A protein has these predicted regions:
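Short, flexible micro-motifs
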Residues: 47, 97-98
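Mid-to-C-terminal alpha-helical segments outside catalytic/metal-binding sites
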Residues: 85-92, 99-137
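Catalytic pocket-lining loop regions of alpha/beta-barrel enzymes
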Residues: 1-92
């Protein structure tokens, strides 16, 4: 089963639709439902950063992150941080879309090479969906 949840960063500016579910609540959810694949909108409210902790990487094995809110929340440099963390394979574009026009994203995605862009735009989603049909957790 696959579920998309909206998450929000616990700090920073307020915006329409910003909720109160942050990284801590999202991590607890992943821990409680390890068999469920979860896409966290808004880059998981920063949850992905905790995947750099070995114990959290295990807990967050079922977590994926959507990039649709990236232009509202972060500088383009965040894509370099995601790459440095080795987590490109867990990021999706379009599961929480449309938020802005596609041109805004195209400028941001210039920070990615062709392989990374293809992963975010399609391959990661296909791999995730294929894992559901294969019964992987």
């Amino acid at each position: 089963m696959l579920l998309l949840l909206h998450t929000a960063e616990p700090v920073g500016h307020n915006y329409v639709g910003k909720g109160s579910v942050g990284p801590k609540e999202a991590a607890v959810f992943c821990s409680n439902y390890p068999e469920l694949k979860v896409i966290f909108a808004h880059l998981g409210g920063g949850l992905w950063l905790y995947e750099l902790m070995p114990e959290m990487r295990k807990i967050l094995a079922n977590a994926y992150y959507d990039l649709a809110a990236l232009p509202w929340l972060y500088e383009t440099k965040i894509l370099n941080a995601i790459k440095a963390a080795g987590l490109i394979k867990k990021f999706l574009f379009g599961s929480d879309f449309p938020i802005l026009n596609i041109q805004r994203y195209e400028k941001l995605f210039m920070a990615l090479n062709a392989e990374e862009l293809e992963a975010i735009k399609s391959c990661n989603a296909l791999n995730l969906l294929n894992s559901l049909t294969a019964g992987e957790t």
